[in-house]
Amino acid sequence: MPHESRVGRRRSTTPHHISDVAIELFAAHGFTDVSVDDIARAAGIARRTLFRYYASKNAIPWGDFSTHLAQLQGLLDNIDSRIQLRDALRAALLAFNTFDESETIRHRKRMRVILQTPELQAYSMTMYAGWREVIAKFVARRSGGKTTDFMPQTVAWTMLGVALSAYEHWLRDESVSLTEALGAAFDVVGAGLDRLNQ
């Protein structure tokens, strides 16, 4: 891959900056053809500095995902307990996936890399597990059960399916907003969630 020089003052190093730089490279050249050295060079940092933020190249497209999971946890924790499970999950899912207009283009590139790169799919399953754990904990708390119980796990897997199907649709059809796609996908399974409150 050709090396690209950077002009101007280097921005401070953050996981977000490194991931943004990498996403642009992956989108332009393909995940396989971009090396860790390419990313470090484009970000204006040393290879060893990059590995202080990310354990592997596969982790980079996900950005600071632990922070995002904490945000999802916070959204769920702040939902009034009187709100029905279906409405609570729908509200949290939409809020978690709402971005400023300026972020939409970059987020589309990021999700295209994550969902459409075969080499990333095994790693992505480990990341999805963390996301499902947050959902399952919330459902278990609402139902008075354990996170590992069948019902919370089933709801968590279902919510992952909702999110992934919505993102796939959003990537295929750029005329559809992400919130529209997520809302429509959620409503397909919403009736089943309603029955959990009965």
Curated annotation (Swiss-Prot):
InterPro entries: Homeodomain-like_sf, HTH-type_TetR-like_transc_reg, HTH_TetR, MftR_C, Tscrpt_reg_TetR-type. It comes from the Bacteria. Keywords: DNA-binding, Transcription, Transcription regulation. GO terms for molecular function: DNA-binding transcription factor activity; transcription cis-regulatory region binding. May regulate a gene cluster involved in mycofactocin expression. Mycofactocin is a conserved polypeptide that might serve as an electron carrier. Residues 12-72 form the HTH tetR-type domain. This is Putative mycofactocin biosynthesis transcriptional regulator MftR. Residues 35-54 bind DNA. One of its GO terms (biological process) is regulation of DNA-templated transcription. SUPFAM superfamilies: Homeodomain-like. It comes from Mycobacterium tuberculosis (strain ATCC 25618 / H37Rv).
